[in-house]
């Protein structure tokens, strides 16, 4: 990462300037990510599956002049030099033929770069660290600006939550994409905070490879999404008892509701703990989680993480706090809440009000402080004068024994 950081500074990278990463979960992503931060830059991580048009839009909006990408992406992305601020591509992997003079091989940079520690840049807690492309709390695409202190605070919050882990003795399986703040914080950052071995999974859909990685490296911490845990539960070789998954101790599930059936089946397979949490790009990345060793309540996203304050407010004005048990919009205050949306002052003002992050999610809180998501505020279905939430319909359909997944 020092080599990459020094290269960026030699090319005139300015503090706060964005640098793009268009990579899957690979060592080059991790090295590039921390190199950008060391140089005082801002990471603009992009999904490698994005089309050239999508990359063009984001590159133009963020103003990135340099993009790191895999060799197999080069041919379809390189033409964007003509229509975006991108001046140079750094290519990871073997290329057919030679690169143009304007571009550079990652391998060459790693072999020949300056490995001295960066001492010329002072990075502050309130400096921007990441641009996370997000649908936002309103559904309109925008870039959430995460600060260094946001990311550090969140990984320390979650370190306190994982009471069954030990410094220097864990292996974190990073199967969530690192180009999303979920993978960044609860994958990369958490592994480093724990002093853990980091196992990067570039394609979690390859269950044979994923299961082999769990066994080979004795993965103990495994953040993921409900679909991946459900897929493991029903994979033929798992059902046949061909895998030893007993190393797994702590799993955090996000991005969608975790069915209790999936949770119980996975815990029976591994004898570890699988808990549901909640977060969003605007508070990179987690704000709630069920206790890893304490009580997990069905349908709940759990309790607020340390340092997080939450309220449930009325949907119309967002100013009146709702009684316990009644649904309203979930608003959050905490050290991980973003700076705002890049060049979107109106959307920022709508989402951040008097220090509170308005999530756009409808939720309720029970008498013990556990929170339950109802649905997205904008997804309400009005039927016969009543409000019906898609999640309520999904919950009923999910009860059928032959239904594995459902979306309304």
Language-model features: locations:
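Structural core segment of the AMP-binding/adenylate-forming
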Residues: 3-6, 10-11, 38-111
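Conserved adenylate-forming
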Residues: 11-13, 17, 113-127, 131-174, ...
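ATP-dependent adenylate-forming carboxylate-activation enzymes
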Residues: 23-24, 41-59, 71-76, 196-217, ...
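AMP-binding/adenylate-forming catalytic core of the ANL superfamily
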Residues: 50, 56-59, 67-69, 222, ...
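Conserved AMP-binding/adenylation subdomain of ANL enzymes
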Residues: 152-171, 181-220, 231, 235
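Gly/Ser/Thr-rich phosphate-binding loop
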Residues: 196, 219-224, 233-297, 309, ...
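Conserved beta-loop-beta connector loops within the AMP-binding
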Residues: 311-331, 350, 367-368
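AMP-binding/adenylate-forming core of the ANL superfamily
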Residues: 323-338, 356, 362-363
